[in-house]
């Protein structure tokens, strides 16, 4: 009966001088190669959809920053040589999408549009301006160049046109008009047999979220976004795909392992869990129907924890009370956390032991099978923990992946012990003090004082120029 109620409710749902920096970014002008129908300014739709807009704005209340590296300094070692070792915060409200990608140390401190460590693709899940630029420039045009090139263009936070065809008649009539605004996401869904236009309403609801809440990588010279789903969506399928094309995100600076970095694979892990298998969608749990002051139902766009709207989410299907369900979820979360830490401890040792083997004169041939085990172990660990809600979405799959990661890490360490013995090293390889984020970063040679100073200079000088240029071009409200 509760399931019928849910379906009925679904039916109604939806450090150069300042003047130099100024001149560099002032030279950028909008391209008008194609007719653009994507309106990226979210406030444009406030009069037509006031309840949805105000609830979307309320994601700004989810403002707390949680430093994942400070909470777990092991991560610094696992990501040694990669920007995530500098800075990794847990996710917060959608209203901070653009702010957070500007402020993270991972994007560096570029001085010009052609400067910096990361490609344009790093904007891809942050703003409806991405959909506008893809429509305007084409995918090749959008992906071309460095991340800093998009600074004056990608300025509106993740919002309406990311998920809705706001230029359609259906949207004008108050219908949801869901859309995949990223062509690469549409191709990925087709690769797993889910063409968006042929999908049902419930499938489309989750597919829209799956444009961003997925694993992806940067493909080819242009660093275009691609989902590694050609062989399937399970961790082993994606691992097989990456291995076949000899892809790596970076090389760990300690062990010299060609590594894979998982992003935020909620769509994949949700699909593997009981909710996904029963088509209980992202919307059902994170964007329920609620009533406004006049008693009218609307979709709550303050995307958040389902327990915050228990009566409108979990209680539609579950007969247990809130406290009982919270206890179950907490137990699952703790089980995954405990195994996660055990795997990390093994991987930390493996990276330092591999470094010791290289230092002792190990050859590429001797190290290859060991590095392969480290790569596969950390990939499986990462895909499990990068999906922050896996304890709810697919706890069994999370534990399975972590168990497999533990086995692979143990294999690597066994092989390392044997190899080190042939080099005359039979003692335990000592670890440096990595008890805090700062100590771990020092252990891998990061100059965090310099990195932070460069970032602050970028935020004080470059970002204001981006915003001024965006206002001049009509991309931001005054």
Swiss-Prot record:
Binding, heme c 2: 160, 163-164, 301
Reactions catalysed, as given in the entry: 6 Fe(III)-[cytochrome c] + NH4(+) + 2 H2O = 6 Fe(II)-[cytochrome c] + nitrite + 8 H(+)
Lineage: Bacteria, Pseudomonadati, Pseudomonadota, Gammaproteobacteria, Enterobacterales
Residues reported in the UniProt entry to bind Ca(2+): 215-216, 261, 263
Organism: Salmonella paratyphi C (strain RKS4594)
Pfam family, one: Cytochrom_C552
Protein name per UniProt: Cytochrome c-552
Broadest EC class assigned to this enzyme: oxidoreductase
GO-annotated molecular function: calcium ion binding; heme binding; iron ion binding; nitrite reductase (cytochrome, ammonia-forming) activity
